Amino acid sequence: MQNEIVKELKALRTTLEGDLHSDDLMRKLYATDASVYRKLPLAVALPKNNNDIKLLIDFAKTHHTSLIPRTAGTSLAGQCVGEGIVVDVSKYFTRILDINESDKTVTVQPGVVRDELNNYL
């Protein structure tokens, strides 16, 4: 990684309420999913709230890098691996937000696991 982007990632880390990892171990853990593909990401973010997501989007836009959304990493086609910042929402974005029985809809955060939703219903 370039020294400048490393400094910028450290600065970003101080503004997030969630977690941001750029160490080799975390990057290697998130370099693959259930597919055969492997790409070492720039960093791994575990945002805690919507503001963290906004800060990550602003950072990616400013530094011309991608954000790769991820939850369980069960993709068989490599959608959640890449050279940008992996954004893992499975730790903090796990709330069921709304159940509308008349419309038969449920609004959830992206980290909600299907089995947990089924148990809740």
Annotate each PLM feature.
Residues 34-36, 76-81:
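Short glycine-biased active-site loop of nucleotidyltransferases that positions the nucleotide triphosphate
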Residues 1-34, 40, 59-67:
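N-terminal accessory segments
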Residues 20, 29-30, 76, 96-99:
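Short clusters of hydrophobic/aromatic residues that line enzyme substrate/ligand-binding pockets
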Residues 12, 35-67, 85, 89-121:
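N-terminal glycine-rich flavin-associated loop
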